[in-house]
Amino acid sequence: MGRAFEYRRAAKEARWDKMSKVFPKLAKAITVAAKEGGVEPDMNPKLRAAIAAAKAENMPKDNIDAAIKRANGKDSADIKTIFYDGKAAHGVQIIVECATDNPTRTVANVKAIFSKNGGEVLPSGSLSFMFSRKSVFELNKPTTDIEEVELELIDFGLSDIELEDDTLYVYGDYTSFGTLHEGIEKLGLEVKKGTLQYIPNSTITLSEEQMQEVERLLDKLEDDDDVQAVYTNIE
């Protein structure tokens, strides 16, 4: 399958950390997950995954607890997850995932970033046939045989599995997030991160010069406070 699903996430998280942006984004993800599925982690696999991702970034427990409590607060009532489709030069397709309490502000910012950096926002749903919504889990490399893990997880909704260095990537349909998470936990495997992501059905390869051109747009999108993730069709 390849891991072209999200733009330079590891590099960007390191950069966010320096910019003190990683915690607010992780906190918002926790709040949204708690709002959508309830504040009890044991009953909410998305919340458990969001908490695991926050802990992996050394987010303090007090911050995590505050983000969960915020889901029941007045301010959380208006937080929504919104997706924007767009395109850049050289055939690059982009889906931007935002969590915002002010869609008017967010869409204005996203449109401005695209237009000022050689891109264009497309009508909602324009790229739905170019990407597939998937559950994606990142696990520490298990001590057991990978093929055994794969066979065990098929009944829980596994569609693909990929080992890269010390990280095992587990994929499933977006509707299988909860059951797949449950299967992973039953095997005693630790989830480092679990998210719903947009995976490109086909990818493109850019030259270094082309990538530098497109990166200006992608960097600006990633830096916006309301943007949670940026997905592209770049290999």
Curated annotation (Swiss-Prot):
<dbReference type="InterPro" id="IPR002876">
    <property type="entry name" value="Transcrip_reg_TACO1-like"/>
</dbReference>
<dbReference type="InterPro" id="IPR017856">
    <property type="entry name" value="Integrase-like_N"/>
</dbReference>
<keyword id="KW-0963">Cytoplasm</keyword>
<keyword id="KW-0238">DNA-binding</keyword>
<keyword id="KW-0805">Transcription regulation</keyword>
<dbReference type="InterPro" id="IPR026564">
    <property type="entry name" value="Transcrip_reg_TACO1-like_dom3"/>
</dbReference>
<protein>
    <recommendedName>
        <fullName>Probable transcriptional regulatory protein Ccur92_05350</fullName>
    </recommendedName>
</protein>
<dbReference type="InterPro" id="IPR048300">
    <property type="entry name" value="TACO1_YebC-like_2nd/3rd_dom"/>
</dbReference>
<dbReference type="Pfam" id="PF20772">
    <property type="entry name" value="TACO1_YebC_N"/>
</dbReference>
<comment type="similarity">
    <text>Belongs to the TACO1 family.</text>
</comment>
<dbReference type="InterPro" id="IPR049083">
    <property type="entry name" value="TACO1_YebC_N"/>
</dbReference>
<dbReference type="GO" id="GO:0006355">
    <property type="term" value="P:regulation of DNA-templated transcription"/>
</dbReference>
<dbReference type="GO" id="GO:0005829">
    <property type="term" value="C:cytosol"/>
</dbReference>
<dbReference type="GO" id="GO:0003677">
    <property type="term" value="F:DNA binding"/>
</dbReference>
<dbReference type="InterPro" id="IPR029072">
    <property type="entry name" value="YebC-like"/>
</dbReference>
<dbReference type="Pfam" id="PF01709">
    <property type="entry name" value="Transcrip_reg"/>
</dbReference>
<keyword id="KW-0804">Transcription</keyword>
